[in-house]
Amino acid sequence: SREWTDILANELQFEESDVHIGILDSGVNNAHPLIAQALPDSRMSTAINVQDNLDHIDHGTGMAGLVLMGDLTKLAYDRGNLPVVQHNLASVKIVDANYSTAPSFYGAVIEDAISQSQDMGADIDCMAVTDSISDDGKPTSSSAALDESIYHSGECDRLVLVSAGNIYQDEDRK
């Protein structure tokens, strides 16, 4: 709720840090009071052909909050005892509800997003978007792009956290 957001925003403390975590997702609404201090406009970008780098599907913003602060439910009950946030964010939009990337170009988008995120100072990237298309474990342009971006010409200096998919409780949604 807005009330909890205001309470947490007033109590959260941010420590200056060189650690940046890139959010490769649907963009981030960096004006959100819990995120604004950790994500300036200068560290927001897009790897797809859309007009802006903001989140219009409320996924990337939630991921940014989770990466920045962890479980907000726990924080809400730890008032007066909140941890100091010791990292910052970068955001590269790779999906949008009104834009469709051809599957054959997923790899190019991922490579571009990781590169942009690193250029904005990210040490670690988080890509928590999934695709319903399965190739039964065979390599795809996406997996090849991840491998190549992480290998980074032999430097192996990048850490990318990738979701393995969603778990559905409803048998009809498998």
Regions found by a protein language model. Name each.
Residues 94-174:
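Substrate-binding/access-modulating region of protease and related hydrolase catalytic domains
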Residues 10-43, 50-105, 123, 136-138, ...:
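Subtilisin-like serine protease catalytic core
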Residues 48-49, 130:
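A broad detector of the eukaryotic-type serine/threonine protein kinase catalytic domain
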Residues 1-13:
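Autoinhibitory propeptides
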